[in-house]
Amino acid sequence: MPLKDIRFVIGQKKYKMNANPFTRRDFIKSMAFSGMILPFIPKNIKIQSEMGKRIGIIGLDTSHSVAFTKSLNLDTQNTVFDGFKIVAAYPHGSRDILSSSERIPGYTEDVRKLGVEIVGSIQELLKKVDFVLLETNDGRLHLEQAIEVFKSGKTTFIDKPIAASLADTKAIFREAEKYQVPIFSSSSLRFATGMSAVKEGKIGQILGADTYSPMKFEKTHPDLFWYGIHGVEMLFTVMGTGCISVQRTISEQEELCTGIWKDGRIGTFRGLKSGKQDYGGTAFGKTGILTLGPYNGYDPLLHQIIHFFKTGIKPVQKAETLEIVAFMEAADVSKQKKGAMVKISNL
């Protein structure tokens, strides 16, 4: 498919549309953008993509699904996407988290207007796609849904949180290895402004880091799993693995989770519960100090996902994802123990 065009199939007829003149910057500014562009797209369309570049989404209960679809199906000027398209989606999805389940009808219509075929089951989806984005907002469903995908052998990206517990996270990796399916999971904040400079060694050896993000809660998930994971993902992107203990301090306005690494380094995550809500942090290096952030949208993560689908090379390793989840679970245990230090090895 030429990158300068979007081709749709309606019945047996092919329609060709000129590439949309708006940029991805316009897309990110507002989810309402879909109301500006979608009326120009014929109804009942089906997006067409090359064999080997067809992506399916599981879970239309999150804005990530709509954002990813807009980028891949409309932004034809981005050569990094290399013709990969979202061609089918299974809507469910959380059924008992109201803030998620009530979004499904609207997001389903949004992606349908972007040329995505809506299917009634994961099995039906798997017959139509080459790769899978497991986007279901409810981490409790990920293990069950992931196993169904793994049995098909399809390479999979699992959006945050990878699961709602450390036990389920371990089980997901175990099942992926059993069926020899490449997977990775990540928050988009891993690729925020400044992160690449840290990884490239611009400030030398990392001595410590402080990160922050909003901290919203969902009663069905441990506290940090729902939203705090964004800041925790940033922390581990900078610090790497090796955290041995976590201690959590709680106030009405904010929370502080302090991690001690095996080499003596200290990393902290600050969860913002009031005041200005944002994402960022500071990395402390041997030769410099670097500000992390601001958040720069979903596309940097999507670039990594497409590269992963093309090459099988994981941008985030299993050990780091497991430790991120262990850190968050240890923070929950610390809360239960009234702020006591919790060793990750004891989980």
Q: Where are the model-predicted features located?
A:
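C-terminal helix-rich "cap/oligomerization" subdomain common to oxidoreductases
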Residues: 29-41, 132-136, 311-347
